[in-house]
Amino acid sequence: MYTYYISVGSNMGDKKGYIHSAFQSLQQHEAVSKVISSTLVETEPWGYTEQDTFVNGMWFCESTLDPHQMLGLIQCLEKEAGRERLIHWGPRTLDLDIILAYDSQGAMLSLNDAKLVVPHPYFWDRSFVLKPLYELLPTFTYKDMTINERLAQLSE
C-alpha cells in the first residue's frame, strides 16, 4: 500500500466543479482508499502569471497503485476534465501533481525518471502547495525544516 499527497488546482471554468468531480472519481477508484481533501483556497498564479486565479488544495489517499500507476490515474482525471497542456504553467481546467509518496513502511519515496519526479521538484518553493499540505500533514519536515518555518522563509 502506498500513501500519496496530491496537489490539486484549477483556474478555468467551474474550478471547484472540476476539482470536486475528480475527487469523487478518485474516491470511487477500486485501487484507492481513504481519500481526504484539505480546504480549497483561492491563490494567485505561479510561474506564468498572466492568467486567472487558481483554486488550490491537497489530497491525501492510500492506494495499491505504484507511483507511475498513480500518475497515470491522475493524468486520466485531468484528461476527463478537459486538461490541455498548451502553455507551461499556463491555464488549466485541472492540475494534479504527486507531491509526496510513501511506501507501505512509511518511508518517503524518492523517484526521478523521465516521467515522474517525487518529491515534486517545486513543492518546497510554493506556498500554495505547502499551506494545504500542512493542513493534512502538520508534522512534516523537509531539509531539516518544518512547513511553518519554510512558509516564513517564503514570505520574507
Predicted regions and their residues:
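Short, structured patches in soluble enzyme cores that scaffold and shape functional sites
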Residues: 8-10, 63, 134
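Flexible, gly/pro- and Lys/Arg-enriched active-site loops
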Residues: 46-54, 65-71, 76-156
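Short low-complexity stretches enriched in small and charged residues
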Residues: 9-19, 50-58, 84-85
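A broad, low-specificity signal for short, low-complexity segments enriched in glycine/proline
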Residues: 16-24, 58-63, 88, 92
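N-terminal beta1-alpha1 ligand-phosphate binding loop
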Residues: 1-32, 37-44
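Short, charge-patterned binding micro-sites
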Residues: 36-62
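A structural signal for short, well-ordered beta-strand segments
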Residues: 8, 37, 57-59, 96-100
